[in-house]
């Protein structure tokens, strides 16, 4: 197992289910204290009860005040996983501005504001790991998801800029770009749609949340200390 360390604290947004929950579990297995964050308090409490050495806070990534409050409760953070995301799909021609703003606000601006909350502490301790969960569509594009794609592509740009700004303080900033993963978001797809997607994946299957979590666990570890500004694709070869 890739060891992160026993004195670190990780903050994982969108941690009540899916990829975020898998990331929280994977990091906890390395001995770090994990702060689970999401909107749903009941789901967070249940998830935290199943993960040793974890706590939870509610957070609304579309609200600057909520972000500040959540990180004030969480305390000093050594590892930040910006995972929370929403979708409001639609063709660009008909997309409402509110749907654009909502997705960008949560997925991109929320990640930026969360990152701002942890930078000072990381800089002071001269150690930090920031891992942004992007998406294969942030690299390849996808029709009907202009807002979501823009937010995920923006996370990659944010990752690269922050990596250059923070390198001198021994803070690494990387992105993980999942492909199609078995989550609540993909469970609603028809079998016909799933089969069509799998036909474009060289490994011929959807990924698991644990596949993404393994990449996050590695990037959070000491073993990944010389990796920064990278985008780690976890997509079964769908996009290269």
Map each language-model feature to its residues.
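Residue(s) in the substrate-gating loop at a strand-loop-helix junction
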Residues: 135
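Short C-terminal tail/terminal secondary-structure segment
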Residues: 6, 140, 217, 228-240
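Alpha-helical segment proximal to the catalytic Tyr-Lys
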Residues: 120, 164-168, 225
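Substrate-binding pocket helix/loop in short-chain dehydrogenase/reductase
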Residues: 91-92, 96-104, 197
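Conserved glycine-rich cofactor-binding loop
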Residues: 16-17
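Active-site loop immediately N-terminal to the catalytic Tyr-X3-Lys motif
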Residues: 93, 140-146, 168-169, 204, ...
């Amino acid at each position: 197992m890739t060891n992160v360390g026993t004195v670190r604290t990780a903050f994982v947004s969108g941690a009540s289910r899916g990829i975020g929950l898998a990331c929280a579990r994977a990091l906890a297995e390395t001995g770090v204290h994990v702060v689970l964050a999401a909107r749903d308090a009941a789901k967070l409490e249940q998830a935290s009860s199943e993960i040793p050495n974890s706590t939870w806070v509610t957070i609304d990534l579309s609200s600057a005040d909520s972000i500040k409050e959540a990180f004030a409760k969480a305390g000093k953070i050594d590892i930040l996983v910006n995972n929370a995301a929403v979708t409001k799909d639609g063709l660009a021609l008909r997309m409402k501005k509110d749907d654009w703003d909502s997705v960008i606000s949560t997925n991109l601006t929320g990640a930026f504001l969360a990152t701002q909350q942890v930078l000072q502490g990381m800089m002071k301790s001269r150690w930090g790991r920031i891992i942004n969960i992007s998406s294969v569509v942030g690299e390849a594009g996808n029709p009907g998801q202009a807002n979501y794609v823009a937010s995920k592509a923006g996370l990659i740009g944010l990752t690269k800029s922050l990596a250059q700004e923070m390198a001198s303080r021994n803070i690494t900033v990387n992105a993980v770009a999942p492909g199609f993963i078995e989550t609540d978001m993909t469970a609603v797809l028809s079998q016909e749609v799933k089969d069509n997607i799998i036909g474009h994946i060289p490994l011929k299957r959807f990924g698991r949340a644990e596949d993404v979590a393994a990449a996050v666990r590695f990037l959070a570890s000491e073993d990944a200390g010389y990796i920064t500004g990278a985008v780690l694709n976890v997509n079964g070869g769908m996009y290269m």
